[in-house]
Amino acid sequence: MATRKTSRKRRVKKNIEAGVAHIHATFNNTLVMITDVQGNAIAWSSAGALGFKGSRKSTPFAAQMAAEAAAKASQEHGIKSVEVAVKGPGSGRESAIRAIQAAGIEITAIRDVTPVPHNGTRPPKRRRV
């Protein structure tokens, strides 16, 4: 029996000028995803994906590296300006925004889209260290 050679579709380089940078900064990690205006993913990165483990993932430096990686990958698709949507209380919020700006992408607007409960579920108990 002859083996059939299956050809995988190569990732098509889109040429998109403007997009949205979604920064999800949790207490444990920071995820940066750059999408087009419709919400289709162009590039993403996270502190954990870059090799940071444990408590190092939650540092501002890890968030900066994740944002740089996502910005570089999105520039290959032609992204020149982004609107930033920040979600979560993590420590990597500001450093991720600065890293995107330093990578040469123009930031047109910054929105805080952190979900606020209208008295939903009970929050976790306070840590006693």
Swiss-Prot record:
One of its GO terms (cellular component) is ribonucleoprotein complex. One of its GO terms (molecular function) is structural constituent of ribosome. SUPFAM superfamilies: Translational machinery components. Keywords: Ribonucleoprotein, Ribosomal protein, RNA-binding, rRNA-binding. One of its GO terms (biological process) is translation. It comes from the Bacteria. It holds the Pfam family Ribosomal_S11. Transmembrane segments: none annotated. HAMAP family: Ribosomal_uS11. Part of the 30S ribosomal subunit. Interacts with proteins S7 and S18. Binds to IF-3. Belongs to the universal ribosomal protein uS11 family. This is Small ribosomal subunit protein uS11. It comes from Levilactobacillus brevis (strain ATCC 367 / BCRC 12310 / CIP 105137 / JCM 1170 / LMG 11437 / NCIMB 947 / NCTC 947) (Lactobacillus brevis).
